[in-house]
Design a protein with these regions (language model features):
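Extended amphipathic alpha-helical repeat scaffolds
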Residues: 2-8, 13-172, 182
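Alpha-solenoid helical-repeat scaffolds
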Residues: 119-266, 273-276
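Alpha-solenoid repeat junctions
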Residues: 152, 180-184, 212-216, 243, ...
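Amphipathic alpha-helical scaffolding segments comprising HEAT/armadillo-like alpha-solenoid repeats
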Residues: 153-165, 185-198, 216-228, 248-261, ...
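Short inter-helical turns and helix N-cap capping residues of alpha-solenoid HEAT/ARM repeat scaffolds
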Residues: 168-169, 200-201, 229-232, 263-264, ...
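Residue-level detector of extended alpha-helical repeat arrays and alpha-solenoid scaffolds
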Residues: 170-173, 204-205, 236, 268, ...
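Alpha-helical adaptor scaffolds
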Residues: 437-439, 445-466
Length: 518
């Protein structure tokens, strides 16, 4: 009876199995190839070409895109074909804006952008607006695209401003503001200011504040927003962030003045965080270090510590260690450890290793271990030594977890060693679980042998079954069925049945039918 209930629950679980996610393959093509696939339309100006597109599309009675290129602001990218990125990302619909650098430190930019307007064929009303990168392959929802060529800035900005101001103020208005901000034109700043001061739509106002920082040269205006106590707090915080993102020289004195004059604690922390992005590194470092050492608000100190590790300075490690040693608040100490990990220096790794071994606070030891794992291959030797010398099982499990984040044959060898060795059961289970996450023939064979052992540790065997269930169904399902049929321990069989129920695999369902029919 118990087994039948388990099987029924397993079958219910099949219906709830999630679909696998797909990933973007970063397909690209020459922008000229993209444009050549569109239908060109002619006209004296942008409005004339929009009318020409309307006339061309009227006979088809299907939604259609009208699209045009424009002069694109430098320092920003839309859906760039990159896999590693450091900076900020903001997504609106199908448009993802990147502001930052590649892994090698190069500014990410995309200059071949176009504004796409999807229209209803009956009313000719715009139902959707996107800014697309012409270097990326797209299907455009299967609708025809009428290409209007390149619009000059004046006609494009005037057209978009009318859309942004039209009622109701909805997603279309917000996309229009984004499109305006992406233009390389001196008039953009005044248009954004107008949205900030007059729009009743808070999303439009917040987006405009963000882009004021990217436009540059607007720190005085942004600082006035931060100081304005009658303004929405979200807008004030966004303005502080925009000052830090502006890359304008001389922003630190402005931020320091705001830090000293603003009374709201949360807003002051936004000001501190903004300093971590400022282009003037020396004054920014001095400002942040002073707050990290002496501000009476521990949350302000923690906020100041976070970005310190990103500064490329010889004295960063020792300054962070002084903060770690002298500050009495646990969260500030944790932030100091995370900042140490970001410095990427051998000296910082040595300090983290020392704390991981010797600190009297177990939570801080574990934090140090986790941050060491973020250092990759450089930390493997220290983590292996730490595991071998450690006596506390919970800390040993933390070391294994940190090691598992590193792609290394030595790490896999260690996981096998621990899984087989005379270690505490919880530690062995941790090693087996982590082996299950490593896709290799060797690890699968080990999990199979462990799960099917007739005289093994039941808890360890159950963990092996769970780990097997995380593998590809081609590997896992036949083995789980075998375990469910033949394992001498009924607890292991039940675990295999539960795991089968979570796979959604037709072979698992057939097995359940077979068993229930008996």
């Amino acid at each position: 009876m118990i087994r039948s209930i388990i099987l029924l629950l397993a079958i219910v679980g099949v219906a709830c199995a999630p679909a696998a996610a797909t990933s973007d393959d970063l397909q690209t093509q020459n922008p000229n190839t993209t444009v050549q696939s569109f239908t060109p339309v002619e006209g004296a100006d942008l409005m004339a070409r929009l009318e020409a597109a309307k006339a061309r599309a009227s006979s088809r009675q299907t939604p259609y895109w009208s699209a045009y290129a424009f002069d694109v602001r430098s320092g920003v990218a839309i859906d760039p074909a990159i896999r590693e990125f450091s900076g900020s990302m903001n997504t609106m619909g199908d448009t993802t804006v990147f502001v930052g650098t590649t892994a090698s430190g190069m500014t990410v930019e995309t200059r071949n952008l176009a504004i796409f307007l999807l229209r209803d064929p009956a009313s000719n009303q715009i139902t959707r607006m996107e800014v697309y990168n012409l270097e990326r392959k797209r299907e455009y929802s299967g609708y025809p695209v009428y290409w209007l060529g390149r619009a000059n800035n004046e006609e494009s900005l005037n057209y978009l401003r009318a859309i942004a101001a039209a009622t109701p103020l909805d997603q279309l208005s917000e996309r229009a503001v984004l499109a305006i901000a992406l233009h390389d034109d001196a008039r953009v700043a005044d248009m954004l200011k107008n949205f900030i001061t007059s729009s009743p739509n808070q999303r439009i106002r917040s987006s405009s504040v963000y882009w004021m920082g990217q436009v540059g040269g607007q720190t005085t205006f942004l600082a006035s927003l931060v100081r304005n106590e009658s303004e929405e707090k979200k807008i004030r915080r966004s303005a502080a962030h925009a000052i830090g993102q502006s890359r304008d020289p001389g922003s630190i004195p402005i931020l320091q003045g705001l830090y000293e004059s603003v009374k709201d604690a949360e807003l002051r922390r936004s000001v501190i965080s903004a300093a971590g992005n400022a282009v003037d590194e020396q004054p920014a470092y001095t400002f942040l270090l002073g707050i990290a050492k002496s501000d009476p608000d521990w949350q302000a100190r923690r906020t100041a510590v976070r970005p310190i590790g990103r500064f490329k300075r010889d004295d960063v490690t020792e300054d962070l260690m002084k903060i770690f040693t002298n500050d009495t608040h646990l969260e500030v100490k944790r932030s100091a450890l995370r900042a140490l990990a970001e410095t990427k220096t051998p000296r910082a790794l040595a300090r983290l290793s020392e704390i991981a071994r010797n600190d009297t606070n177990a939570e801080l030891r574990k934090t140090a271990i986790r941050t060491m794992g973020e250092r990759g291959e450089a930390a493997v030797d220290e983590l292996l030594k730490l595991f071998d010398s450690e006596q506390v099982p919970e800390v040993k499990r933390t070391v294994l977890q940190a090691l598992s984040e590193i792609k290394s044959e030595r790490v896999e060898d260690k996981l096998f060693e621990v899984a087989k060795a005379n270690q505490p059961t919880d530690v062995r289970r941790q090693a087996i679980r982590l082996l299950g996450e490593r896709v290799s023939k060797r690890s699968f064979e080990f999990l199979s042998a462990t799960a099917q052992s007739a005289d093994g540790n039941a808890e360890v065997q159950m963990q092996a079954v769970r780990a097997i269930s995380e593998r590809r169904s081609e590997e896992s399902v036949p083995l789980l069925i075998k375990i469910a049929r033949t394992h001498p321990n009924h607890l292991i069989r039940k675990q295999a049945i539960r795991s089968l129920g979570e796979t959604g695999d037709p072979r698992a369902i057939e097995y359940f039918r077979e068993v229930l029919s008996k």
